[in-house]
UniProtKB/Swiss-Prot annotation:
This is tRNA-specific 2-thiouridylase MnmA. It is found in: Cytoplasm. GO terms for cellular component: cytoplasm. It catalyses: S-sulfanyl-L-cysteinyl-[protein] + uridine(34) in tRNA + AH2 + ATP = 2-thiouridine(34) in tRNA + L-cysteinyl-[protein] + A + AMP + diphosphate + H(+). Residues 167-169 are annotated as: Interaction with tRNA. Keywords: ATP-binding, Cytoplasm, Disulfide bond, Nucleotide-binding, RNA-binding, Transferase, tRNA processing, tRNA-binding. The active site is at 121 (nucleophile), 217 (cysteine persulfide intermediate). The keyword Transferase applies. Belongs to the MnmA/TRMU family.
């Protein structure tokens, strides 16, 4: 079995694991990853309890399949639990998911932002619920099928990237505190997706060859604009499309239909490549520019969470999107002299493309996650200096 908690070269002491026979909650979606994670926990001798959160409702016409919240996936989670001989429970958290994930998602798009709903779900729904549920049932440990690692160091439990850099999900878990990490197990952290898939097939797990969705679980079509429009039709604000010289070159039905960096589907033709470089929800304007206008020298970071040993200014690497290669930079802490409120600014060593408000800026040093927060604004050279 892969190591559940791994030593980090030079700084970490050997990872402590729950003793054999300890009770462990495993979040089960019915997918390959959580199924293999559950099987590995069973192999390690733990008393494993499967838990599925019912988060979203889908049409009953069979049009939605292989999503982490679809009815058949909940059924698959139970089938896997039966296959492994472990108890399985489903808890209804649809109202919580709507409040903390879906509604903020809609609000963010109306505000011209590109949100990170998977971060909100992990922070405010899944782990927020799993820890109390575990405590209520006398369970000390919680496990998930995320591709990430927890390392026990002198200062406490730390979050590290998963070994599979293509599947690494530490970006979506950056907000976890040390006391939470100390109770988390990531059985897949040292494995690649191909290894996990092969293991699921070899074990004969139900759903072992199930496909993997690249879309949000609550918008399986990937069509975000209609989803937002259906839920906020009376708040959509038409506005102008403006080129880099300030000329109005078209109109649109709402900023919710655009994201920074978008090139296709803008609705106008300028005779040259044009990209969405800014969204102004207050005026309703969509600003276009050349590809070079997409690059930012820095980012203002809000709602930040940092590890307790972070010292500023912090020299590290910053990921501004889940699939973005981390860019070197310096994170500075600023304090408002009037209110005392803290804010943070990331200054990149070289300009970074498509820094989108609403996405997360997650900070790394090597494989270790130091923290991060929501991108409030992309900063041009003069603003980041």
């Amino acid at each position: 079995m892969a190591t559940l908690v791994r030593e980090a070269d030079g700084t970490a002491r050997p990872g402590e694991r729950p003793s054999s026979g300890a009770r462990v909650f495993i979040a089960m979606s019915g997918g390959v990853d959580s199924s293999v994670a559950a099987a590995r926990l069973c192999d390690a001798g733990y008393e494993v309890v499967g838990v599925t959160l019912h988060l979203w409702d889908y049409p009953d016409d069979g049009s939605v399949k292989s999503r982490c919240c679809a009815p058949e996936d909940q059924h698959d989670a139970r089938r896997v639990a039966d296959h492994l001989g472990i108890p399985h429970y489903t808890f209804d958290r649809r109202a919580l998911f709507r409040e903390h994930v879906v509604d903020p998602f809609v609000e963010a798009y109306l505000a011209g932002e590109t949100p990170s709903p998977c971060v909100a779900c992990n922070r405010s729904v899944k782990l927020r619920e799993l820890f109390p549920l575990a405590e209520r049932l006398g369970v000390s440990w919680v496990a998930t099928g995320h591709y990430a690692r927890v390392v026990l160091e002198e200062g406490g439990a730390r979050l590290y990237r998963g070994r599979d850099r293509h599947k690494d999900q530490s970006y979506f878990l950056h907000m976890l505190r040390s006391d939470e990490l100390s109770r988390l197990l990531f059985p897949l952290g040292d494995s690649t997706k191909d290894e996990v898939r092969a293991e699921a097939i070899a074990r004969g797990l139900p759903g072992a060859e199930k496909g993997e969705s690249q879309e949000l679980c609550f918008i399986p079509s990937g069509r975000y604009a209609p989803f937002v429009a259906d839920r906020a039709a009376d708040r959509l604000r038409p506005g102008p499309i403006v080129d880099r010289d300030g000329r109005v070159v078209g109109s649109h039905g709402g900023v919710h239909g655009f994201t920074v960096g978008q090139r296709k589907g803008i609705g106008v033709s300028l005779g040259r490549p044009a990209f969405v470089v800014g969204l102004d929800a207050a005026s309703g304007a969509v600003h276009l520019g050349d590809e070079g206008d997409l690059y930012a020298a820095g980012a203002e970071i809000a709602d930040a969470v940092w590890c307790d040993d972070a010292v500023f200014p912090l020299e590290a690497e910053v990921r501004v999107r889940a699939r973005h290669e981390a860019a070197p930079g310096i994170i500075e802490r600023r304090r408002d002299p009037a209110t005392g409120a803290e804010s943070f600014v990331a200054r990149f060593a070289s300009p970074v493309r498509s820094v989108s408000p609403g996405q997360m800026a997650v900070v790394y040093r090597g494989d270790r996650v130091l923290g991060g927060g929501r991108i409030k604004a992309a900063l041009r050279s003069q603003a980041a200096s």
